[in-house]
Amino acid sequence: MGTMLNDFRFGIRMLLKNPAFTAVAVLSLALGIGANTAIFQLLNAVRLKTLPVRNAQELAQVGLRASDLQLTRGSKGLLRYAPMTNPLWEQIRDRQLGFAGMAAWGMAGFNLAQGGEVRPARGLWVSGDFFNVLGVQPELGRVFNQSDDQRGCTAPGVVISHGFWQSEFGGSSDVVGRKVTLSDRQLQVIGVTPPGFFGLEVGKSFDVALPICADAMFSGANQRLDSGTNWWLMVTGRLKPGWTIAQANSQVSTISAPLFQQTLPSNYPAASVNDYLNSKLEVVDGSSGYSILRDNYERPLWLLLAIAGLVLLITCANLANLLLARASTREREIAVRQAVGASRFRIVRQLLVETILLAAIGTSLGLVLAQALGTFLVASIGTTRDVVFLDVAPDLRVLGFTASVAVLTCIVFGLTPALRATRVSPGAAMKVAGRGLTAGRERFSLRRGLVVIQVALSLVLVASALLFSRSLNKLLKLDAGFNQENLLIARVGFNRLKIDPANRLAFRGQVLERIKATPGVKDVSEMDSIPLTGGGRGNAVWLEGRTSADKVDASFNRVGADYFKTLDIPLVSGRSFSTTDSRSSTNVAIINQTLAQMLREPNPVGKRFVVEATPGEGETTYEIVGMARDAKFEDLRESALPVVYLASFQDAYPSSGRQFLIRSNLPPTNLSASINQGLREFNPGLDVNLQVFRSMVEESLLRERLMAKLSGSFGVLALVLASIGLYGLLSYGVTSRSKEIGIRMALGAGTRNVLSLILHEAVLLVLIGVAVGVPVVLYVSRFAKSLLFDLSPTDPVSLVIAGLVLMSVALVAGYLPARRATKVDPLVALRDE
């Protein structure tokens, strides 16, 4: 133990003796380990962690079999997890055998009136046993039980989250019994959840939870408790002791047929009845909860972790090179220690202790850096409207990962230099007096090999950064089929005004006219779905006179008369909508070019098409009055989708809110305040939210931005590390070859010849590194294929640019040592020898 302590003391002295070396080594390690830890923390939170509830491994999800997800086609989007209807949930709860308890939940949105202002609140509908099934105990008060979730509940309590308690009530201990106003209804707080509980959807949190029975109170005639066509509840259960997921799945599958038979809605379309009755339920692991965020980011995060791992390998190669150079200058010291009896093991241990000290300091700083970077990463995948909630605090898994990385780093960059430094015999080392015997043993030394590895790995990182950056740039510059500039989105809610459904269309028209009257507004239109932001209703259509066998799945958007004018989408034929297209006139529609092609009708204006019946609406026929040019509808990445545009004035079920698309003559940000003020003056009861359209589009590219930013940062870091390694190697080479350079200059070699000699070695090393790296790039880039847009993972342009960048780095890194070589005095060099 005493000798080990002496080794640590000596190691500390040696590191302090070489502050420049120590600073470079520690900073490199901190960046490499910090980046890896930060990305692993995020991956851990999104994918690896189980839910923060009691015995999460006992939880399972119950849902529709993947092939039956079309049953929920009331909306068109990326929802992977199909929800249930309330009647179906109640039947599952009452007839299953494999679960000790079951819970249902669904997302909700409320208008929170607190502190004199109205703002959105994130809500959960939960069954009475929700918290008990999960084993969540309240921080204060109590949580719901079965008696709280009974049909006809008129004064339900509300359970609030820990975060909501802190932000809205300042963590007051007397919060239980106080009131919150949600969508104009006052509810009493009965409890507060613990700080670590966010619900069952990873990446989201909630503010308030209400029992499912309260839906009738908030939704009135549109309540969903008895509806067999509203799919809105997720189902989770806790397995009974001794039951496995496979056994529970078998039992639930067995009862699927009678469950769907019993819950078949009386108004279900005849064409879809068989699909409904043949559906099956399945049980899958629920320990990690639900997560759309996970579906979107799991693959990118694994890829980023691999990229960060390459950065760490470059760091290790760089540090190994530095340690080899340092060891060569300590050969005389090591020789003396061997001569006086120190064993090779003892010297290797001493050198490894110095490596361990570097790794320990670098890892400690890396953990600090990881926390800051982790917070940045979470913020990078969320927006002000869609805040991401993830706990990236280090747990045992993260600490274990970091410790493993630190140990491997020690082995990779510390062991080889230590073993190599002790291979030289004391006599030989004493003769050369520390002038680099080890470095001169082979022409293509280990240090040159390490630089080649750095260059090869840097090529992979730089090429990856170019691929992701160019992919993002293509998306940002893509022609969406309409003018995206100077557009503003206004979301206007008038639920608080309690306007009768019969008067909502007229009121929406008044709101539109008020917006249009705002100075600076050029055009304005209402709409159901905002372009390029996902979602929207979908259904099947076919031309009248043909059969449903010719049907085409299309997206729908109900829009105002000036929609196409506002977006600068030209009509290829026919007319736009007008105010005369009312509920008392013929149903009219405008279709896009793609739908016309899929319907095999080059001149669709004047033709009629049929919309397939849904559980909420029978078959409907529309007359085509216009054909619009194709424009991106749901997503920038999509190919042209078949789209049906319906007239807003013919909306049979107008909602208590509307979205308006505004074309401005001014910068949109300058117009927001005027529109907001005008609408408040028009009616103070309106809930208004405004956002620049272009910023919404950019928010839809958060994943692509994250990949471009991080891969670009890692690419730059790799270039810096590679240039340091190359510079260090060439500088040491100039020092160790001073005699050779002196002789060359004595024999007539000029400055250009010496420059060429050193730069030739730099270029040669980079060329070899690029040659090694190209096949690696071609192999690994295929894993990024699904994350690229309109770009091949083997894109030759990106590869060539990456090679040229590395060549430029080689010339820059080699120039200073080459210039120093030209300053060698032949007489001094020869006399020193």
Predicted regions and their residues:
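Structured, solvent-exposed hinge/loop segments at the ends of secondary-structure elements
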Residues: 36-176, 181-188, 196, 228-231, ...
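Alpha-helical transmembrane segments of integral membrane proteins
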Residues: 1-22, 289-293, 322-349, 353, ...
